[in-house]
């Protein structure tokens, strides 16, 4: 039976290899992808892949770090705390802020000068707006119905009327020389302040009109002071612009002649206006002077005058 089973033939070189290398262990080579030989087409593909990949150190593809978001961290412990000064001032309106400053100046008198020098200079429009606010308060204080010129109405509006007159007395010196050096600002303020005085109520009782007459007297003195100061600057050229002669004459008419002294001062300063009568019945000399003045302002003076040539 054994003779019938044939053993597979073994090549003779296999036995020779086993006999020669039996003294040392034979290591079987392990297959790795990198150990095999690469073909020419593999080298070309690998080269193309390396060329297509951009290096990480290329300046055109330098990775940029995104800016970190400055997010406020949540406070671990939530507790109440007062507002900071800037946030507190944002919640105050004009009246509340004015009250805070007034209270601080009363408790610390040394702050008065600092506040005065730090605060911006009030303009003509802002000052007149304050006076108009007092005027609106006065008008709203009149009782409904009845006689608005009676003693009862006067007693009802006496305090708002006093507040308006006090504010007028405080603001007027601020816009007078030498505190105000620009005559145009002084004239504009006096124009608006005089209109407010015109709107003051007239009372049946003459004694109640003393305050109104005093206001006209003070504003007339202010007009005279500003006119004299403006006449010293540029030969009174500031008074000739804006039609101040007509405005002052109208104010004098609305006041019942209480500003006549200011009208006379303006006429004396200009030299061509001598009161309201001469405006309607002006002399030929006054008209000639006014015509010359208009020619000087328009730049046409002397265009038709012949010029002599040669010895005089």
UniProtKB/Swiss-Prot annotation:
This is Tethering factor for nuclear proteasome sts1. GO terms for molecular function: proteasome binding. Belongs to the cut8/STS1 family. Residues 1-82 are annotated as: Disordered. Residues 39-50 have a biased composition (Basic and acidic residues). Keywords: Cytoplasm, Nucleus, Protein transport, Transport. One of its GO terms (biological process) is proteasome localization. Residues 52-65 have a biased composition (Low complexity). Residues 19-34 have a biased composition (Polar residues). Involved in ubiquitin-mediated protein degradation. Regulatory factor in the ubiquitin/proteasome pathway that controls the turnover of proteasome substrates. Targets proteasomes to the nucleus and facilitates the degradation of nuclear proteins. Binds the proteasome. InterPro entries: Cut8/Sts1_fam (IPR013868), Cut8/Sts1_sf (IPR038422).
């Amino acid at each position: 039976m054994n003779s019938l089973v044939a053993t597979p033939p073994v090549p003779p070189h296999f036995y020779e290899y086993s006999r020669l290398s039996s003294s040392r262990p034979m290591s079987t080579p392990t297959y790795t992808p990198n150990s095999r030989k690469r073909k020419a087409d593999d080298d070309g593909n690998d080269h193309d892949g390396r060329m297509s990949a951009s290096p990480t150190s290329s300046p055109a593809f330098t990775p940029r770090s995104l800016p970190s978001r400055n997010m406020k961290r949540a406070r671990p412990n939530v507790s109440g705390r007062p507002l900071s000064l800037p946030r507190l001032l944002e919640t105050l309106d004009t009246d509340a802020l004015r009250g805070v400053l007034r209270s601080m100046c009363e408790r610390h008198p040394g702050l008065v000068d600092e506040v005065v020098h730090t605060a911006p200079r009030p303009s003509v429009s802002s000052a007149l707006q304050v006076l108009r606010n007092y005027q609106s308060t006065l008008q709203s204080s009149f009782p409904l119905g009845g006689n608005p010129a009676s003693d009862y109405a006067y007693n009802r509006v006496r305090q708002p009327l006093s507040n308006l007159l006090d504010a007028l007395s405080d603001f007027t010196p601020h816009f007078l020389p030498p505190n105000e050096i620009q005559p145009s600002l002084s004239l504009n303020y006096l124009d608006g302040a005089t209109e407010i005085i015109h709107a003051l109520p007239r009372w049946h009782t003459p004694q109640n009109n003393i305050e109104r007459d005093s206001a006209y007297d003070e504003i007339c003195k202010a007009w005279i002071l500003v006119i004299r100061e403006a006449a010293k600057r540029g030969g009174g050229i500031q008074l000739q612009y804006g039609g101040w002669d007509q405005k002052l004459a109208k104010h004098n008419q609305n006041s019942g002649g209480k500003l006549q002294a200011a009208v006379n001062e303006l006429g004396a300063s200009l030299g061509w206006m001598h009161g309201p009568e001469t405006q309607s019945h002006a002399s030929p000399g006054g008209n000639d002077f006014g015509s010359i003045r208009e020619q000087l302002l328009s730049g046409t003076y002397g265009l038709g005058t012949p010029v002599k040539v040669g010895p005089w």
